[in-house]
Structures are given as C-alpha cells and as structure tokens.
From Swiss-Prot:
Gene: rimP
GO biological process: ribosomal small subunit assembly; translation
Domain of life per record: Bacteria
Record's GO cellular component terms: cytosol
Coarse class of the protein's main subcellular location: cytoplasm
UniProt-recorded name of the protein: Ribosome maturation factor RimP
Record localization: Cytoplasm
Organism: Vesicomyosocius okutanii subsp. Calyptogena okutanii (strain HA)
UniProt family annotation: Belongs to the RimP family.
Keywords, comma-separated and alphabetical: Cytoplasm, Ribosome biogenesis
C-alpha cells in the first residue's frame, strides 16, 4: 500500500501545510468492503476536534475530485494522540530514549513485534537501535510496518 499512501501524501501535504498543520503520516488499512484512510496531523499547539473536522472537510473535497482510492473507505483525520505513531526517520530521532512498539513487514529471527527503547538512529544506514529486555537490536526503518510510542503509567 506504499504506493497509495505516497500518492495521497503528494496530493494532500501542500494543502495541510497551507492550512497551518503538519502532515505526520498516513495509514491505509484495506479491510474488505470498507477500508480506512487515517491522516495524522499536528501543530505546535494542541490539535482539537475542530481542527480535525476542518482538515477532514478540505480533504474530502479533494478526494471527491481526485479519487486517489478506488472503492469505499472511511476517512479519519486525527491528532497523533498519546501513543503517537512514528512514520519517518526524523520521528525516531525526535523520540530517542522513548519506549516504542514496532510491527515489522516480515519476521526478523522469527519475530514480527518488538518492544523497547529507541537507543540511536543511524542517518547513514537508515536504521534504529532498539534496546529491549534481551539487549540491543538494529532494525532497518524501511522494514517497520507500524511504530507507536508506548506510555508507561
């Protein structure tokens, strides 16, 4: 689905930025008859429900014309929330030392899910060091399907 999200990113990023928000990332979940398109936005102040509604209406108008996804889907515009999703290398860099849960595109040594602390980010190799209970592991950022911060209470 990377192609769909890349196409949508190219289409909506200038619009969202023009409205004063940052496009954090996009999740597209193809789920039978009704797929879900999640757009995560942020700003230097908190995101309100009203902000999400304004962006959603603007994007709906664009999607009605451009039709980047065939078939029916639900559009969700959201703030990143407390368990913030991480989409890009810069996101991992911003949250060094934070707990994360990672889900990989394919198993690594028989494991698809990882939990630990972001120890470091390599700009050169496009990898992160994840420090967990069993020690440190180096993971390729391009192989991470989904990543979220994990909050300890």
């Amino acid at each position: 689905m990377a192609r769909v999200t890349d196409k949508i990113t190219h289409l909506i990023k200038p619009v969202i930025e023009g409205m004063g928000y940052e496009l954090l990332g996009i999740e597209y979940v193809a789920s039978g008859k009704y797929s879900i398109l999640r757009i995560f936005i942020d700003t230097n102040k908190s995101i309100s429900v009203n902000d999400c509604e304004i962006v959603s209406r603007q994007l709906s108008s664009i999607f009605d014309i451009e039709e980047p996804i065939s078939g029916q889907y639900n559009l969700e515009v959201s703030s990143p929330g407390i368990e913030r999703p991480l989409f890009h290398k810069g996101h991992y860099q911003c949250f060094l030392g934070f707990n994360v849960k990672l889900h990989m595109f394919r198993p690594i040594s028989g494991q698809s899910n990882f939990f630990g602390v972001i120890g470091s980010v390599s700009e050169i190799n496009n990898t992160i060091e994840l420090v967990g209970e069993l020690g440190a592991i180096i993971l390729d950022i391009d192989l991470i399907k989904k990543a979220n911060l994990v909050v300890d209470f």
